[in-house]
Each structure stands twice: as C-alpha cells, then as structure tokens.
A protein has these predicted regions:
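Glycoside hydrolase catalytic-domain context in secreted enzymes
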Residues: 1-255
Length: 257
C-alpha cells in the first residue's frame, strides 16, 4: 500500500489496471481513493467481459457470433446477467461490452466478437445483453454498467485490417450500424460508450461531433461518458495526423463530446 500511495500522490494517474483482483482488494483501493485523494472521488472499476469476465475462474460463454447463431436474443440477456453478477462479485462496476460492431467483411480478424452482419439481429442482441447486464436497478449487487463498443463503424475496415478507416460512408453507417447502438442506448439504456479508432469519410470518430454528441447524446439519450478506446485520442496526432501535438489531440476530442 505504501507503493500505491507513492504512485498516486506524486503522479498524474488516470487509470490503474488491476486484472484478476478480488472484491476485497478493490475495496482497499477504493477506500484509499475516498479517504486520501483531494476530491475523494471513488474509482470506477471496469473490465473486459465480452463473453465472460476476463479474470481467472470466471464463466466463459460462447463468443457473441456463436450466441447470435442461436437466433435467441433472450440468451444475450441471460449471459449479460451472469456476467454482471460475476463482475460485481469481483468488485467490477462496469464492463467494456457488449461489442456492437456490424461485420460485413469476413477478412476482419475480430469478427467473432460481434453478433454478425444483420442489423436487426445485432440490435435485438444488443438491447437484450445490455438489459441483462444493467437490470432495472444498478444499485443491486448483481448488475453492472454496460459500455457498448466500438462506436461506430469499426467492424468494416479497409482490407479487413483492424483500426483501418471504415469502408462504409455515412449513409450506410447511419442506416446499418447506428440502429444497433440505438437499441443498446435508447432501448437498453446503456450507461456509457466506447468510441472507436477508425475514421468515417476521413473524420476520426473520436472527434466527430455529430456522432458523439448530436446522435449519441441527443438522439439516443446516452447519459454517461464516452471512453476512448485505448489510444483513440492520441491517434489524432500520430495516426490520423490531424492534431499537431498530443495536447491538441486531447483538446479536439474533448470539444466534440
């Protein structure tokens, strides 16, 4: 705990990764945040949980593409609830899931993470999975906040290459991809969102005001925050070459959410 105290007191730490932690360990860290930081803001413990919580001894369910092959969206709700219960038992409050990417290119190496290529089927599973995770009361000990990803157009990259620009134009993104997220946010009431690395019509999603604010918040009613997918913000500087500095990349993202 002394090492942790030194780390938190003398560094600008934005997040701490504690994979495989127990609820007891999470409580120790949480108590430190509340009692020893200037504002006393509790930490939000989040984790990957695509088809099961990413930790030892958690239940591993079929990948989403396998679940979608059942054509039974209610199974998504059952899986979501089971994942939520196991996550909360480990001290996790939020999951980086479910994946809402619509896959139209079989070369894409992460196709198994999605619910497939059909907008309607993906939307049905999206809503049910979120409802299973969040339930009707997030204060109960068997629910977590859902963070659907990757918003948006991430599953259709040029050449099937991960993170590459989306091959779909805005018309196809709005008509095919966004209804899946609408089901998760407007119907399922998902709390937060994770934005994607890709660009659509040369505009990086991580700084797309129309998608992040007008659509996600204005139309879909997303109440929480937008999390950048790992380096999605810094890539405005060293990948998309739009920002002149890393600081400018941060500014461009913040002013558009």
């Amino acid at each position: 705990m002394q090492r942790f105290d030194a780390l938190m007191q003398h560094n600008s730490v934005g997040s701490v990764q504690l994979r495989g932690m127990t609820a007891a360990q999470a409580n120790v860290v949480q108590r430190y945040a509340i009692e020893n930081t200037r504002l006393g803001i509790p930490y939000l413990f989040s984790e990957e949980a695509l088809h099961g919580l990413m930790t030892n001894n958690a239940t591993s369910f079929p990948q989403q593409i396998g679940l979608a092959a059942s054509f039974e969206p209610e199974l998504g709700r059952e899986m979501g609830h089971a994942i939520a219960a196991e996550s909360r038992a480990c001290g996790i409050h939020e999951t980086y899931s479910p994946v809402m990417d619509l896959i139209r290119d079989p070369r894409y190496g992460r196709a198994e993470e999605s619910y497939g290529e059909d907008t309607y089927l993906c939307a049905e599973f999206a809503r049910e999975t979120v409802l299973g995770m969040q339930g009707t009361d997030l204060t109960t000990p068997d629910t977590v906040a859902a963070e659907p990803k990757h918003y948006v157009g991430y599953g259709n990259p040029v050449g099937g290459l991960n993170c590459a620009p989306c091959t779909m134009g805005r018309h196809d993104v709005f008509s095919d991809c966004l209804p899946v997220f609408e089901a998760a946010f407007a119907d399922g009431k998902a709390c937060d969102a994770m934005c994607s690395y890709n660009s659509i019509d040369s505009i990086p999603v991580s700084m797309d005001h129309e998608l992040l604010t007008d659509v996600l918040r204005g139309q879909f009613g997303m109440p929480g925050f937008v999390r950048s997918d790992l380096t999605a913000v810094s890539r405005l500087y060293d990948w998309h070459f739009i920002a002149e500095t890393p600081e400018e990349a941060i500014r461009l993202s913040l002013i558009h959410i």
